[in-house]
Every structure is written in structure tokens, then in C-alpha cells.
Amino acid sequence: MKKLTIFIIIISFLTANIKPRARDLGIPFFGKPGRYNAITDVKGVEVGHSTIISGKGKNIVGMGPVRTGVTAIFPRGKKFNPVYANWYSLNGNGEMTGTTWVTESGFLETPIMITNTNSVGVVRDAVLKWYVDYNWYGNEEWWYTYPVVGETYDGFLNDIYGFHVKEKHVLEAIENARSGPVKEGNIGGGTGMLTLGFKGGIGSASRVVKINDKKYIVGVLVQSNFGSRKNLTISGVPVGLELEDTLKLVYNAPPSNKKKDGDGSIIVIVATDAPLLPHQLKRIVHRVPIGIGNVGGRGSNGSGDIFLAFSTANKNAFNRQKTTTVRTLPNDLITPLFEATAQAVEEAIINAMIAAETMDGIHGNTAYAIPHDRLIKILKKYNRID
């Protein structure tokens, strides 16, 4: 009966053009997810994407093929209301702008944007222009905030030196930002990304935790583009070794441009409605690598593993003139939030892989989606699903 159920679920997703997620395949995870099992389960958080896909065949710089985009995350919708935040880098072969001020001030004052490595500058500049045009600061007499823009490298599939992300794509991602279910896989900034030897991209997940009889949400969004297939682990099963010779990456570019095994990056954004101060949010992001390690991440030399966490609690914490009173959980009670963070990161990465579809790009380079049918058989072999 369970076999029939899984089959029906997969068929229904295909016919409805809705991408399945890890739990839809029966993959087990620890912890209880929120309504959407996404970062948007944290009230006020909005996510939007702009996706750019065009061309096929040989790479002509400036012409394509293009496989890239932009993703936008707003902590409290499209209004200026800074949140407590902090960040951490497991391995710093990457970039996230604006984090120096996040560390210094303890606040995230801007939306978070994620794109490809070569488009950080244009995205940052476009966000600054949007501040002015949108009147982001409202009645605040404010002179400047530092846009937070993260990146991962999509040059295996994308004409990354063609600089195809433009201001209009940044504005489109911002305008598309909304609450509710989060689109995953080959979307937005994750369009051209790879994960653990298969196609990757954007993924999201959430957890509900109870502390002193009060429920809190931890939500995660990843732009996943890291790892070596041999390390891929799902539900504790060495899936990568089982699929080591299946649907390998097709690489037709010049040898000098070949991607090294294990290189890549991952951007992780953690949101919570639990009342946490910046130093506690630093502790939250320190737990992100646990989830990455659970699926096979190793923080390689060529990887940019950069994480940021924010709390939407304490809505009036930011004030330029007055003393404010804020709430915070005691350190002795926040271990469940650590566990929830690791769990949601792990599931978000797998969701990115499950939602991703096979994609070809420059020179016919191809990244295959992880085969759902084979994955289910492997997990059954190891008694992880019935």
C-alpha cells in the first residue's frame, strides 16, 4: 500500500507541475516541520526569485548559455524594521557583503540577496537604488545601510563571465517576494548550482520547537552548490557511494576550467521567531555545519560556506534615539533551537536536490537530477523507508 502511495504522490506532482519534496518520497527526518516546511513559516519572512535561462551549446561569453538568477529574502516584509542577526563562515572561499556591520551592530537592516559569484556587485548596487525608489527608510532620517548579498559559483552551467544578471532581475526578485510555499530547485540564485555530484539549487525547511510551553519556529533557506558525490548521505545512508557511477556530471569545457571535485559553496539563511540576541544567533549559525555534515559536506578549501541567522522577535528592538526593552531566552533553554537548526539545514539541502531537474548549460555541460526511483530503492535497501 505504501508503494502505491509513493507512486501516486510522484505522479500527482508530475501532472500538476509541482515539484516533489524529500518527505513526499518518504524520506524520514527528525523533528516536526511547520505549515510550509520552509523559512516562510517564520511570520513576516518573504522569499522571491528571478530566474534567467536562455541558450544552448557552446559558450559564447556575453551570449550564453545562461543559467543563473537572484533570490531575495525579507525578514519582516518590505519595510525598514531591522532584526537582530549574526553570521558565521565555516570556510571563507566566498562572499557575503554587509556582514562586517552585522557583526558590529548586531542588526540586519536590509533584505538578503543571493546570486552567482560574478553578480554580487550589480545586485548590491541595484538594492541600493531600490532603497531610494521604494522609500525603504520611510520617515527615518537615515544615510546608509549595507546590502547583504551572498553568492555561489554557477560557472559549470552558466556563462558567468557574461554578467547576465541586471538591475531588472534584482527588482523582479524583490517584487516577487512573498510568504507561503517557497519554490525550490532550479530557481532564482540556485538556477545553475550543483550539490554533491547532482543538480542542486534552492531548498528550504523548518522546525517547530516547544520551550516552556511556547512554540517557536526555526526556518532555513539554502542556496546549495557544494560537495563530492562520494560523500552524499541521506538519512544516514551512503547514497553517493551507491550512485557513484550513475548519471555522472558531463563536462565538455576546456580542462583548465574543470571544476575540482568537492569545490563549491553553500549559503544558509536561518530565521527564527524565538527571542534571541545577536550573540545567541551566533551560536545558532555555529550549528549549521552539523546539518551540512549530515548530508556529506566537508567544508573543502574551495568552498564558500557562509551562514546568517536572524530573529524576528523583539519588533521594536531597533531604535536610534530611545532606550528599548527586549526579551531573550536564557542560554539554558536554547538547545532545542540548535537541534532544529541542524535538522532544518539537512532537510533543506535534500529538498533542493529532490526539487532540482536535470540541466545542461555551457558547452553542453550537464548536471543530472538525483534519480528519485533509485534513491527510494537505496533507502529501502538500508531499511530507512518501508
State the predicted function of each range:
Residues 4-13:
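Sec-dependent N-terminal signal peptides
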